[in-house]
Regions:
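Helix-loop junctions at the membrane interface of multi-pass solute transporters
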Residues: 24-25, 33-38, 51, 65-69, ...
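Membrane-interface "cap" regions at the ends of multi-pass membrane proteins
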Residues: 1-61, 174-177, 190
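Helix-loop-helix module between adjacent transmembrane segments
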Residues: 77-174, 251-255, 346-356
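Loop-to-transmembrane helix boundary motifs in multi-pass membrane proteins
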Residues: 116-126, 133, 363-394
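Hydrophobic alpha-helical transmembrane segments
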Residues: 3, 7-11, 47-48, 76-80, ...
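Extracellular loop-to-transmembrane helix junctions
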Residues: 2-24, 67-107, 111, 193, ...
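Loop-to-helix junctions at membrane interfaces in multi-pass transport proteins
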Residues: 1-2, 39-41, 45, 62-79, ...
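Residue-level recognition of pore/gate-forming positions within transmembrane alpha-helices
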Residues: 14-17, 53-54, 82-86, 129-133, ...
Length: 394
């Protein structure tokens, strides 16, 4: 009965994502609508879709798993770097990119670069598109694979079948609704991710014996609760965190300035003045979400200390939220539905990244390579058909 409730919750979630795509299927009249939502995105959707598409399942699996094993230093400095990178990206890049891309009527990042630097031969268009395709197609495929692995590990469902179903859902709402569907589903997925973090955190603290017990356990472990050292679980010792470690860990935040699927959100907002509000929303959510994720890792270890959760070594530490969700599901039907929502949050984290990267890769093929570099003359209807066909091929 528990598994049925969990699976039903996840199925309802997936169907809802498809319905969003169908709801926006009639709103795409040209390439600008399909790839940028007609530049009519509001500040909330812009902010939350950008951050949801950035975080991926790493927020709900990798980060709490790292905190569970090593303490707060490594995930903490990573979070600081990512928060700074997020804020600076919105502050420095967003307004200029929105203004210039609108003036140049550019709807993709490679096209913007080509027009901005007067590339008459469209070499920047082609090069940028190839780079996006080379790196985003495998990344998107890994997202589909992650969805398949999640269903297989939880319910014993055939891996290939689960992956194909997940891919069909993501491709389905992307191909029908385009950018509007992707950003709207990303907003919904960010909410589901947030609810998952809150639910796991509240239950976990109770199962660990309370917040004081969680902190006391963390304090008893060498290097666990300091930003200047990491905990070595195998040896039970602390390893100092050098300046080089700090800088290299924080450097993750530098990647934001070159992420096409995030930059497209800047180009799509309805008014550049609203980017200030978007920046505040995005920065606050990122800080809160990553802080909660790190604390969940610490709470998970507290649950292990209290005997509520087995010790998770190595890569199994990344399943700490999944294990907690399974414990929640044992407390009745409503609890099983909540557990399904938590697992849907992990699925949402993966889907929100995969759909955005798939759309960016598809736009690179149909818009930058075929039309700009290849000089194919297509009507708006033909261009939309090429865009949708490219998504299927990607």
């Amino acid at each position: 009965m528990t598994n049925i409730c969990i699976i039903a919750t996840i199925i309802i979630y997936l169907v809802a994502m498809l319905l969003v795509g169908f709801a926006y299927s009639k709103s795409n009249n040209d390439s600008t609508d399909f790839y940028l939502g007609g530049r009519k995105m509001g500040p909330l959707v812009t902010a939350m879709s950008a951050e949801a598409s950035d975080m991926s399942s790493w927020l709900l699996m990798g980060m709490p798993g790292l905190a569970y094993l090593t303490g707060i230093a490594s995930p903490g400095w990573t979070a600081i770097g990512l928060a700074l990178g997020t804020w600076l990206n919105w502050l420095i890049v967003a307004r200029r990119l929105r203004r210039y891309s609108a003036n140049l009527e550019a709807i993709t990042v490679p096209q913007f670069l080509s027009l901005r630097f007067h590339d008459q031969r469209n070499l920047l268009n082609a090069l940028g598109a190839v780079i996006i395709i080379v790196f985003f197609v495998p990344y998107t495929a890994s997202g589909f694979a992650a969805c398949g692995k999640l269903f297989h590990s939880l319910f014993g469902v055939d891996y290939m079948a689960a992956m194909v179903v997940s891919a069909c859902v993501i491709v389905g709402y992307t191909i029908t609704g385009g950018f509007r569907a992707v950003t709207t589903t990303d907003l919904i997925q960010s909410i589901v991710m947030s609810l998952a973090l809150v639910a796991v955190l509240v239950y976990g603290i109770g199962a660990a014996g309370g917040w004081d017990a969680v902190v006391a356990n963390a304090q008893s472990l060498p290097g666990y609760l300091t930003m200047m050292a990491s905990h070595n679980a195998a040896e039970g010792t602390a390893t100092s965190y050098s300046l080089l470690d700090i800088v290299s860990t924080m450097a993750w935040g530098l990647g934001y300035f070159g992420m096409p699927h995030i930059l497209l959100r800047f180009m799509a907002i309805e008014d550049e003045k609203k980017l200030v509000l978007s920046r505040r929303i995005a920065s606050v959510w990122v800080i809160i979400a990553m802080t909660a994720s790190i604390i969940i890792g610490m709470v998970g270890l507290g649950m292990t200390k209290a005997g509520a959760l087995e010790y998770l070594s190595g890569s199994s530490s990344e399943t700490v939220i999944v294990r907690i969700a399974n414990l929640i599901a044992q407390h009745g039907i409503l609890a099983a539905v909540l557990a399904g929502l938590i697992l849907a949050g992990i699925l949402a984290a993966t889907m929100s990244t995969a759909d955005s990267q798939m759309l960016a890769a598809a736009s690179s093929v149909s818009q930058n390579i075929l039309q700009e570099f290849g000089h194919m003359k297509l009507t708006e209807r033909q261009s939309l058909f090429a865009a949708r066909l490219t998504i299927i091929c990607v």
